[in-house]
Amino acid sequence: MGLTDYCECRFSAGNGGNGIIAWRREAHYDKGGPGGGNGGNGGNVVLQADHNCDSLFFLKNKKHLFAESGGNGKPDLAHGKNGEDLVIKVPVGTTVRDLDTNQILMDFVHDQQSFILCYGGKGGKGNAAFKSPIMRAPNLYENGDKGQSLHVSLEIKYLANVGIVGFPNTGKSTLISKLSNAKPKIANYRFTTLVPVLGVVKHNDQSLVFADIPGLIENASEGSGLGHYFLRHIERCEILIHLISLDPVDHDDPCQAYEQIMRELSKYSQLLVKKKMLVVANKTDVDLDGTRFQKLAQYLENKGIPLFKISALKQELGDLVAQVFALHQKTLAQFGANKFHLPMEMEKHYVFEQASETDHDPLNIERDALGRWHVECKRLHYWFDKIPQTTLDNIRRLGNKIKEVGIEDQLKVAGAKKGDVIVFAGQEFVIND
């Protein structure tokens, strides 16, 4: 099973069950009365981070997933069954984005962290819920609310402190294998690393997670090669190690290699080039006379950038590890300990209640070429779906809701007269007064 770190899917919470009209017939209730139960609530769609989950493969071919809908109400005041929640486990490091608004909804950075992505619809009331001193035998009931539905992307961004970037075959995999217990595939050809490799590096009773990212090539940010696909995994890193090979077989000019990688990082995201970065020259064992190192060091010195030199193959790493840990501590002191969170527009948690969402929705009225008045209003749509037009009591209640919206007054202001036709929700109505 290959790495699947991105997928798109629509999730729909369960609809609320419908209330019903029923009457009590028990022997000890001689006067009977309403007995229709309420519908059950629809199940929620819940996302939960799980450290045992490391891929989105199980969602790759899922286009639409549903939570269970609530059951309808039953006689004898029986409540409909509530729908079961749909719980989806995702890897720690998963970011959830609303594809319709491009807004980040949730960023999972802790094990067992959970988030209700879609709220289930509320169950409709049965006629027993409408009983009152002035309405002892109501012929009223409601349909359940629709569950919330969202089209989202799920994207894994690994929780690594340090990301290692560079051209293919610069020695990134060798470096992480010498620093940690990671066992990446190592060979003397390009694109040996096909997926990100994580390793834990320890120093003075502290530890950091390093990530070896597949090699970048020119125009990687525009889709060339493999590395661009995995650049998302270093968005959370506090520090980047920019590894440059001194072997002339790998690049003609190490200075040009530095600039090309920096351009690709910049084109992908300005956040990457603003991160703390250590530029490291590798394969010093090949640069026997040191001319390539001196050329690169002078070039970077003119930019005010220090250059470290190592030979990962010979484990000549100098004080690189100490420098990385010192820079990490400095970064934490500057930016705080909430290190793995991505910048979010807002951490939005939905509270789904359809009626309240539509209370302040504007009423739009337009007249067509036939003289009919077309009315659009989310709040009115909500009540047309909510109140079935099957009993006189329900029709009267719907009429009251229409008056509350103020549709009659606004139609008069627009110039509507008695006998004009109103078109709403696919139905036509005639103005009688």
Swiss-Prot record:
Residues 1-159 form the Obg domain. It is found in: Cytoplasm. Its EC number is 3.6.5.-. Its cofactor is Mg(2+). One of its GO terms (biological process) is ribosome biogenesis. It is an enzyme of class 3 (hydrolase). Belongs to the TRAFAC class OBG-HflX-like GTPase superfamily. OBG GTPase family. This is GTPase Obg. It comes from Mycoplasma pneumoniae (strain ATCC 29342 / M129 / Subtype 1) (Mycoplasmoides pneumoniae). The lineage of its organism: Bacteria, Bacillati, Mycoplasmatota, Mycoplasmoidales, Mycoplasmoidaceae.
